[in-house]
A protein has these predicted regions:
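Catalytic cores of carbohydrate-active enzymes
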Residues: 1-114, 156, 160-173
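C-terminal substrate/ligand-recognition segments
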Residues: 114-151
Length: 173
């Protein structure tokens, strides 16, 4: 989101571009260098300065962050081919989760008991819940990069849900 904020600032205040454009480029480059998993075509969930807080037998890199990926796309961090692969993975995750839309926060969810907050159960709230406005960010990103038909297809379950519920709700499980 910082990259998007820098882009917005430089657009609003063109005189700042000389100072901030190189910083933006360095952050984008380092984001790709340290967080992009080329082999799995996804972002690494976290890099810990010390040990992971999770058990040694838990592979956190198997978790796919839908919302973070959408924001990375909006920030211009992914190529069109990577966006296509990302969308395919999101659709695959929706099917695997039995969810309605690409608004999933992440998939698969963290196992029960991994968080101090007891409400962070699998498929609850930010641990695999389906958030229409998260999905909306991906819809916007798809349109931004020319995937208009795909955006139209993926927004349909969101619109259907809003119509069926006679309103827009924060999240679904």
């Amino acid at each position: 989101m910082f990259l998007i904020a820098l882009d917005n600032m430089m657009e609003l205040l063109p005189d700042t571009k000389e100072k901030w454009q190189p910083i933006r480029e360095q952050i984008a480059e380092n984001s790709r260098k340290h967080l992009w998993d080329e082999e799995n075509q996804k972002f690494i969930p976290h890099i810990y300065l010390e040990d992971s807080p999770f058990p040694d037998d838990f592979n956190e890199n198997k978790i796919y962050y839908h919302g973070g990926t959408a924001m990375a796309i909006k920030a211009g961090l992914l190529s069109k081919e990577e966006i296509k692969v990302s969308l395919e993975k999101m659709v695959e995750n929706v099917k695997a989760a039995g969810a309605a839309s690409i608004g999933l926060t992440l998939y698969p969810p963290y196992p029960k008991g991994f968080f101090e907050n007891e409400s962070m159960v699998p498929y609850g709230y930010q641990n695999g819940g389906d958030w229409t406005w998260f999905g909306g960010r991906m819809i916007h990103a798809l349109i931004q990069y020319g995937f208009v038909e795909e955006a139209y297809e993926q927004i349909q379950p969101m619109v259907k849900r809003v119509k069926e519920n006679d309103g827009f709700y924060e999240w679904y499980t």
